[in-house]
Every structure is written in structure tokens, then in C-alpha cells.
Amino acid sequence: MTLPPTASPAMLQAAMRIQLKQSAEKSFRAFVEQAWHILEPATQFVPGMHVDAMCLHLQAVTEGRIKDLIINVAPGSAKSLITSVMWPAWAWIIRPELRWLFSSYRAELALRDSVKCRTLIESPWYQERWGDRFKFDESQNQARRYQNTKMGYRATTSVGTGTGERCDVCVCDDPTSVDQADSDAERNTANTWWLGTMSTRLNDQ
């Protein structure tokens, strides 16, 4: 975007806003940095290779260049915030019809991130930029499951439970707790549940 040398501060500000919006649409990494203050107003965004890697790979999944992805990072690396909260909010900008199914070893954790995702989408920052892409369907408006007007939805479940939902994107964020991870029985339970239940919920891609 080229502006005349005499461009006013208001014009420069508007041009910068357009550039930032376009950057956030094209790059999940840019979206994460720009959206960070909405969800973590008291914590400064700190760039890092792990953030870049997560964003790069999740964007590749969205674009169909990666089918299956495992993310292993240290606790406190913003994995849940980036993967379970920001990712579906960003993907709905370009593909609002996507249907998501999220799970965790505790239902409360999956519910927490579902609420955070909706908070981000309903924020003035998001609505001012992409509020015309879709609206929430008020007839399908629950914390555990909400749907938009493009027929996309975000639903949650927990490890070990069944679900009748089908999805385009299936995410299990922490299938076991840190304590359970050392237990062969708990790992086997999580693996059996994933292979026997969650993996069968994916729509044909």
C-alpha cells in the first residue's frame, strides 16, 4: 500500500490497521501476536522458536498440507492457548464452515478453552476486523458447543467418554495429566480411547 507524502496521521493509522489485518489473515503466527493482548492483557507476548513452530505447523494443518500432528512442548509454552483457543478462532476467519472437536483428560480444561475461544471471537478487536465473516447461531449457543451461521461449530468432550459429534478437525490437548503420564495403564486407556473413539469422528477430507 502506497500513501502520498502528505498523508495525514489518520490515513497512516488506517493503512497500518489494514496491513495488520491482512497479515493476521495470512499468517497464524501474526494473528497470535496481535490477539495475545485480548486473552493475556497482563502478560507480554514473548516470541520464541516454539511459538513459531507451533503456528507454522498448525497453519499447515489448516491449509491441508499436514494431516496428522503431534505437539510436544514443555509446560507453560502456551500450547493450549495457541492450539485450543487461538487456532480455531483464526481458522474460522478463512474457513468458518470448519467443525472442531476438542478434548482433554479433564472436561473442565476443554470447557475453559472453549470459553476463551468464544471470548476472543466476541471481542471488539476480532469483531471489528472479521465480524462480517460469520455470526454465532443463538439456537446452538452453549459453553461446550457453539455453532456459527456458516454451519461450523466447536464442541468439547473428555478422554474416556463417547461423543456423537463428527468433525473436520479433531484435537486432544493433554490426553493425560502430568502424573498420569508415567502410568502405563493410563497411557493405554488414552490411546485406546483415541484410536477407538476420537479417530472415528473425523469427516472424510
PLM feature segments, named:
Residues 1-67:
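N-terminal accessory segments
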Residues 55-59, 81-93, 173:
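Contiguous, well-ordered alpha-helical segments that form the cores/surfaces of helical PPI scaffolds
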Residues 65-88:
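Walker A/P-loop
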Residues 68-70, 99-101, 153, 169:
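Residue-level preference for the first positions of well-ordered beta-strands
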Residues 90-99, 122-125:
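Post-Walker A helix-loop "phosphate-sensing" segment adjacent to the P-loop in P-loop NTPases
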Residues 103-160:
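Conserved nucleotide-state-sensing and coupling region of NTP-binding domains
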Residues 143-197:
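Conserved RecA-like ASCE ATPase "motif II neighborhood" in helicase/translocase motors
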Residues 200-203:
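ASCE RecA-like P-loop NTPase motor cores
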